[in-house]
């Protein structure tokens, strides 16, 4: 490492091997006492967190500049403004904190035009005067150094960030870091949301949904059926576990059909992987498969989940384009920005997901039937559509508790590969499907603000939590991996270890925590902002509660099977794809669906249902969102958070936000007082009195005339 004047170069040594946590600091020569981290800085670290380097006297941003200290630890990069009061209750959610895994790009800047990427092993031609930290959550941290970057500590903190970021893809390095309040109290901590890790959790949820024709299966308790499935799931009462084991072997990755949600009117929403067509099932296996798919209903609708929805590669490409467009340093001209936004295809994919979820919601709520979501892997789009269908159909899922339970059941417990899809194992299979789902939920929140108990701030907190590696919720791909890491399973075999519910000893306490432990990362005042002040429980009808089969549920002919694809229902001669299989379900040629156009939803064309089902009214409690043109909007508070000038003027979603915005406007009005006419000055108004709309309009008009003059 050497230093010189402007124009000289420095080299960032490549990482030769993955060191243990904190070894970056331990392997260096001890710094002089004056350069050791102060006790004040060290006291602000989380248990297990170590300061690698820091640089005081840096400045953040351009206008207005904010001076402070840039700190790099083995967990995050944080900027601490001068005089900033650190809050022990909120150690991880500062707007100045960037988890290492959240850093998407690190750039060095010198002058006005010299910009280079910083990565291990790269040779740079100049000393950085500034560094740009691009967050994968659409945030940007711009930090300038004193003396044009010639201070040794500026170079040290830059080196530390580059090296620490290179090591951040190793999830095990966070195993010794715990949240500051995680160890408070004695005994095990009760999860705020059922984690769906025990048979009791599944039985409680089954009773809550009144799914009387279903039971909790323990066939996968040792994860010997499928490691990506939860230990427990719901299967029909009359199916034995031995039949479940054989039937699941004929589906991709062993993910056979199981209940996702039971509608109060009687319909069942199932999900499964693709048929394993290379298998050779016998007659008993085919019978078990069809009984599980039929779920005791005379009408069965098989939904091709991947039809008309983007592929994983499409989702990843659209997200990369969106992130590049929304960053402050985007080179797209303002007059072409909307066209560039349309070119990302992100909003098109949001529109496609909402449209298909609306169609499936109509299928589930309009008749008593079995609706099966089928995706080859059953771990991505099935979870997205199943969750959206429940949000559209069940008011309970729109509550704060219900939504968190929904995500835990349909995403976390169901085996969505969070670590892979969020880029934790490399970019080859990265695809932020869960973030696409959160955008869809935000669209629903904008269109139906009185129907959701949670606010936009809650969605933002959940969106940002996927980039904070403080719990195992988003650090593992399957329930088996989470159980193995937390000591519930043997590390090398899929053998069940009794007593897994007991919290592990030592520093691994946080392994039992989940993303839903908001009180460990947020203050009570911040958690209050998760509530939507416009939520009206009375707005949600009570007719969705369990009751006998309603009049709008009209059963069809016996044993009818349909394929829902491209907005139309097509009859199937048999349910299983195996050649010459003695299918128990066959459709009669006289029950043919009416022609449907793929570009229109079922709700827009009387649902496109077969004529024998008759005309049915929309069931109460069902939300049918709009998805045409301007009805689908950009989530500006999330994607444009790196542009403060765009954030100004956004509507405040909470009462406290409205109060802050009102205080800001009153402060502006007090500053504009000299522009008010003499007649207004003679009134001797109290500066804290709220002006009425007429007076505000007069002030703004006077300001505008003064600016024009």
From Swiss-Prot:
GO terms for molecular function: phosphatidylinositol-3-phosphate phosphatase activity. Belongs to the protein-tyrosine phosphatase family. Non-receptor class myotubularin subfamily. PANTHER family: MYOTUBULARIN-RELATED, MYOTUBULARIN-RELATED PROTEIN 11. Residues 196-639 form the Myotubularin phosphatase domain. It comes from the Eukaryota. Expressed in bone marrow, spleen and thymus. This is Myotubularin-related protein 11. SUPFAM superfamilies: (Phosphotyrosine protein) phosphatases II, PH domain-like. It comes from Homo sapiens. One of its GO terms (biological process) is phosphatidylinositol dephosphorylation. InterPro entries: MTMR12-like_C, Myotubularin, Myotubularin-like_Pase_dom, Prot-tyrosine_phosphatase-like. GO terms for cellular component: cytoplasm; extracellular exosome; membrane. Residues 1-39 are annotated as: Disordered.
């Amino acid at each position: 490492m050497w230093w010189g004047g402007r124009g000289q170069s420095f080299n960032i040594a490549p990482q030769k091997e993955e060191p243990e946590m904190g070894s970056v600091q331990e392997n260096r020569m001890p710094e002089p006492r004056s350069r050791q981290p102060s006790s004040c800085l060290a006291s602000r670290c989380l248990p297990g967190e170590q300061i690698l380097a820091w640089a005081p006297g840096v400045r953040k941003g351009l206008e207005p500049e904010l001076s402070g200290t840039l700190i790099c630890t083995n967990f995050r990069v944080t900027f601490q403004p001068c005089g900033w009061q650190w809050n022990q209750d909120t150690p991880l959610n500062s707007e100045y904190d960037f988890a290492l895994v959240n850093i998407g790009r690190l750039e060095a800047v010198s002058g006005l035009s010299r910009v280079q990427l910083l990565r291990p092993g790269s040779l740079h031609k100049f000393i950085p005067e500034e560094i740009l930290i691009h967050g994968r959550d659409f945030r940007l941290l711009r930090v300038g150094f004193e003396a044009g970057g010639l201070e040794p500590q500026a170079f040290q903190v830059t080196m530390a960030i580059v090296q620490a970021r290179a090591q951040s893809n190793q999830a095990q390095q966070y195993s010794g870091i715990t949240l500051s309040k995680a160890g408070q109290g004695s005994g095990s901590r009760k999860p705020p949301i059922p984690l769906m890790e025990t048979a009791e959790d599944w039985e409680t949820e089954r009773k809550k949904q009144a799914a009387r024709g279903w039971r909790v299966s323990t066939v996968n308790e040792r994860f010997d059926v499928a490691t990506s499935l939860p230990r427990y799931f719901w299967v029909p009462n009359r199916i034995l576990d031995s039949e479940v084991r054989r039937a699941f072997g004929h589906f991709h990755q062993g993910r056979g059909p199981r209940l996702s949600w039971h509608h109060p009117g009687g319909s069942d929403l199932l999900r499964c992987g693709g048929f394993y067509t290379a298998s050779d099932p016998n007659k008993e296996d085919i019978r078990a498969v069809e009984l599980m798919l039929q779920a005791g209903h005379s009408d069965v609708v098989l939904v091709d989940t991947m039809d008309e929805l983007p592929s994983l590669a499409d989702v990843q490409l659209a997200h990369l384009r969106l992130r590049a467009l929304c960053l402050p340093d985007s080179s797209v001209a303002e007059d072409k920005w909307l066209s560039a936004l349309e070119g990302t295809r992100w909003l098109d994919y949001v529109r496609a997901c909402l449209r298909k979820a609306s169609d499936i919601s109509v299928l589930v709520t309009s008749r008593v039937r079995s609706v099966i979501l089928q995706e080859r892997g059953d771990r991505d789009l099935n979870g997205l559509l199943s969750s959206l269908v429940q949000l559209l159909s069940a008011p309970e899922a729109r509550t704060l508790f219900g939504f968190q339970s929904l995500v835990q059941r349909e995403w976390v417990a169901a085996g969505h590969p969070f670590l892979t899809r969020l880029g934790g194992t490399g970019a080859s299979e990265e695809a932020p499907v869960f973030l696409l789902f959160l955008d869809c939920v935000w669209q629903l929140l904008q269109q139906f603000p009185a129907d959701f108990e949670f606010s936009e701030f809650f969605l933002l907190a959940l969106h940002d939590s996927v980039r904070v590696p403080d719990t195992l919720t988003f650090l593992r791909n399957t329930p088996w991996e989470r159980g193995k890491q937390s000591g519930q399973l043997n590390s090398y075999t899929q053998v069940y270890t009794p007593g897994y519910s007991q919290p592990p000893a030592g520093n691994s306490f946080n392994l039992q925590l989940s993303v839903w432990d908001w009180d460990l990362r947020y203050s009570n005042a911040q958690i209050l902002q998760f509530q939507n002040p416009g939520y009206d429980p009375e707005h949600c009808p009570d007719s969705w509660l369990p009751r006998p089969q309603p009049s709008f549920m009209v059963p069809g002919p016996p044993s009818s099977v349909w394929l829902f694809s491209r907005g139309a229902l097509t009859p199937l001669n048999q349910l299983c794809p195996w050649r010459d299989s003695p299918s128990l379900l066959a459709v009669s040629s006289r029950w043919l669906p009416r022609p449907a156009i793929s570009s229109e939803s079922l709700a827009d064309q009387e649902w496109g249902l077969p004529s024998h089902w008759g005309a049915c009214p929309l069931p109460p409690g069902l939300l049918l969102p709009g998805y045409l043109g301007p009805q689908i909007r950009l989530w500006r508070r999330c994607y444009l958070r790196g542009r403060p000038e765009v954030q100004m003027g956004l509507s405040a979603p909470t009462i406290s936000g409205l109060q802050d915005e009102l205080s800001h406007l009153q402060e502006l009005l007090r500053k504009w007082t000299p522009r008010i006419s003499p007649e207004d000055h003679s009134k001797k108004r109290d500066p804290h009195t709220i002006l009425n709309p007429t007076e505000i309009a007069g002030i703004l008009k006077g300001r505008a005339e003064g600016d024009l003059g």
